[in-house]
Regions:
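Histidine- and aromatic-rich ligand-binding microenvironments
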Residues: 15, 48-49, 66, 115-116
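Short hydrophobic beta-strand motif reused across regulatory alpha/beta modules
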Residues: 42-47, 108-116
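Bateman (tandem CBS) regulatory domains
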Residues: 1-7, 61-72
Length: 122
């Protein structure tokens, strides 16, 4: 699981030009979108960004909150890696937000399918 500064987190009002740089720098293919209070409001993948760029003429100035997927899939920090992998396979996604037991709207980490596969846990 990636934690702290390794998590690609942005605020809802960030412009796409800056979001694109962050998703590229963090190399996870995903951005977690947070409200001002730190609660997670959405997610955007690199695939989403490619599709959005083709749709909108003024892509660079677009705010991420207008195109993010709301209520991203998340797991409790105590969830087994095999369970997380199963969820990713079922939902056909590559990343899950991770939260503390009592704070399901506050992302504390992100787990990527490759992290699980590289650790040989399945």
């Amino acid at each position: 699981m990636k934690k702290g500064k390794k998590i690609p987190v942005v605020r809802e009002n960030i412009k796409m030009k800056k979001a694109l740089k962050i998703i590229s720098d963090k190399k996870l293919g995903v951005l977690i979108v947070n409200k001002k209070n730190g609660f997670t409001s959405g997610i955007v993948t690199d695939g989403d960004l490619k599709r959005i760029a083709q749709k909108y003429e003024k892509f660079d100035d677009l705010e991420i909150k207008k195109v993010m997927k709301k209520n991203p899939m998340s797991i409790n920090e105590d969830t087994l890696a095999a369970t997380a992998l199963s969820i990713m396979n079922q939902k056909k996604i590559t990343s899950l937000c991770v939260h503390k037991k009592n704070l399901s709207k506050k992302t504390i980490g992100i787990i990527h399918m490759h992290d699980i596969l590289q650790s040989n846990i399945n």
